[in-house]
Each structure stands twice: as C-alpha cells, then as structure tokens.
Amino acid sequence: HEVIHQASEMSRKRGRIVLVGVVGLNMRRDDFYKKELSFQVSCSYGAGRYDEEYENKGHDYPLAYVRWTEKRNFETILHAISSGSLDVKSLITEEVDLADYEEIYGDMRKKGSIASILRFPADSKMESVVSIGSNAFVSGNGKIGIIGAGNYTSAMIIPCLAKAHARIKYIASAQGLSAKILARKAGAENATSDYQNILKDPEVDLVMVTTRHNLHARMVIEALRNGKSVFVEKPLCLNETELDDIIRAYQGAPEGTTLTVGFNRRFSPFAEKMRRLLGDGPKNIVATMNAGFIPREVWVHDLEIGGGRIIGEACHFIDLCSFLAGSEVVAVCMNALGENPEENTDNASILLRYANGTNAVINYFANGSKSYAKERVEVFSQERVLVLDNWRKLTGYGFKGFSSMKAGMDKGQKRQFTLLNERIREGGEPLIPFESILNTTKAT
C-alpha cells in the first residue's frame, strides 16, 4: 500500500501509475480520486504475453489498439542497445565459467552482483540424447520409443507399460527436461530432445506418439517411412488430407509394420463382455459422454492444434460403437447445441448408420453436472438391453445367465498396452484392423 500511495503523491493530475512486478494492492480511493489518476498492471514483457494467438500464431495487435506490444518492446530495446543509446555492458558485474555456477547462485543477496554471465566451454558439444543408465537392454524385440512426455503419458501410459513389463528405450520431448524426468521414473534407457533419434534407431520396434493432436499425423508418417510400427494416441489426424498421407505411408511401409490408435475403450472387459453378449445383427446404441466444461482458451478447442473436442475425444465413442456393432459406419449426421453453433462445438448429438443396420446415437455434452456419471452406454437388441454405467457396472436385461457385472473403473488402457507389448515382442494380428481405424477416423 505504501508504494502505491507514494506513487500517487509523486504523480501529476490525470497521471498513470504502472505496476511492474508484484506489490500489495490495498489501495486508497483518495490517492486516485483527487488527481483522477489511472492505474495499470503491466504484463511481464508487454501486451501479447500469454496470448496464444499473438505469441505462437503471430497475429499482431494493430498499432492504434496497442502501441507497446511484447514484440515492439523487445525491438525498441534491441535497437537502443545496437545504437549505443542504452548501455547494458556496464551492468555486467562478472563472467563465470559454467562449471563454477555456484559462485553466482551460492548467496545472491551477499554477492552484490547486478548481472552475471555464465560462460559455456567453447568446445562443448550439444547432445540431444542423455543416457539414463537404469535399464541396459538385452538383445531381442519389443523396444519402444515414446514421443511426448505430458501428463497423460506420465500418469497413464507409463504405469500401464510398466505393468506390461515393456522395454522403453527412449522418451522424447521438445525441451528435453520433462523427457529426462519421466525417463528416470519409467526406467527408460535414454531421454532425448530430438525424436529423430528414435526414428533412426534400428533397435526401436514401436514408436508411440503422445503429443498434441496437430503433430500426430506428421510423426506417424515419419515413423512409418522409417519402418517403425506406430501407436498414436487419438485422434489419428485432424483432416482428410492428413489421413490420405497416412494411408499412403502405411501402404508403403515394410511388411509387418502396424498402426494402432489409442481407442482403448474397446479393450475394457466391460466392452468385451458386451460384444460377446450382443453377438451379430443390428442394434440400437445410445452412448452419452458427460465430458465436462473446458475453457475456450485451452488448446483442445483450437481447430489447428487440438481439432476440437469432437475430433479429439468423441472419436473414442465412435470406435466403441463400431466395436459393439461389429460393422462399419456408412452414414453420419450431427446436430450441435445452439442457434448458431460454433465449428469447434463440444455439445453435439451424432447419429451413425452402420452397414449391418445398426443405429448409434452419441451424445457428447460439455454442459452437464460433474455429479453425474461421465460415460454411459445403452444397447437395445432382440428384446434385450445392456446398460454400462461409467465403466464400473454393466447391467443386463433379458439375457439368460447374465444380470450384472461390477468392477473398479476400467476403460481398457491396461489391457490395450499389455496386448500391444505382446504383439510387438511376439508378432500377431494388429490390435485394431487398419480398415476399422480408417472408418472411425473418416466418420469423425
């Protein structure tokens, strides 16, 4: 409060107080009222900071709208330094070899330094692979390279692979640090900041792509062209052009190269039980995803990066319905919520028509209550009904010898990765037929 008060005392009438950094904001009205002062909090580098459209997509603010943007601030400072009007050299207190970094960071308050420079060795070689050394592999098949070290990879994929006793040779991430941390946790042999090291290693049999959605297609194609089998988290791709390129890469890959998409729900014991009980023939399927609200600024809504939640998430249930139907989608239509729904809507009802006469309705809603089950599937067939409640309980009506099945929540991830690891080591048919993957992706 005192800092703001002093600033108001110093300011002229109708002046502006700009806060750079963090101080308490317990302000007094009188400090601003008498002089009609304005108060502004400055973003760290200037307007545009934390704005995805500005920072990563290059959409600048008009000059008349914002004079000093993040980019213009940097440009002005760099120009001032290059012209000599701003002297920063005199601020440099010391230069220290990287090996002696503790001289700077030991006790910064006592040091009295204004600015310090860390000097890297002139002959140092940039390495994109770091050996973790916890697991030296023996000869044999089944080695895996993972591209992507995000939350889902860490929380779900790595534990499932560990239970399957999978051999992870690489974990890659763009920055490298997250890959190294996760590699230590997973017992992987290497961490890398360049996924090309995975693609070019002849010992790697399976490449797992777990990055943001817009990178899936490119990395799948590169892996296939390098003769690697691929597992990619859903979705396979974001548009038909990418899908056509994937088809060509798959058809041109060496014999025995497989492509699997992370449609894990079909591998749940609940889904497999439903498929056995229902058998063949036409069915009516109603699948509801109470997906929950995600703020609009989150990347999954960005059509160029995430593809929207229908492409990015609802594809799970299109594959599940296809698995339960035992047939391929031949027609699709969709109605979205609202008078003028957005292209990246996350409130929609999807109607699927299958070749064997099955009808499926998928309700993907983001406007429901968190207290209601996230996922529910109902199937009607031959005077029988199956109801799956949130992957915890399956109830049957009209079935001889079956009434219900209960277990802990199981969406099929564990079985999916166990089977995948077995296939990579021992060979066998693809987990999901390529034609089924294509059909689901086209329908999505």
Explain the meaning of each model-derived region.
Residues 126-186:
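N-terminal Rossmann-like dinucleotide-binding module
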Residues 106, 110-122, 284, 312, ...:
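Contiguous beta-strand/loop segments that form the cofactor/metal-binding neighborhood of enzyme cores
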Residues 6, 20-38, 42, 48, ...:
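Rossmann-fold NAD(P)-binding glycine/threonine-rich loop
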Residues 37, 47-65, 81, 256-258, ...:
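Predominantly a Rossmann-like dinucleotide-binding segment in NAD(P)-dependent oxidoreductases
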Residues 12, 217-263:
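Beta-strand-loop-alpha-helix segment that lines the small-molecule cofactor/substrate pocket
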Residues 18-22, 29, 36-37, 63, ...:
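C-terminal capping/lid region of NAD(P)-dependent oxidoreductase domains
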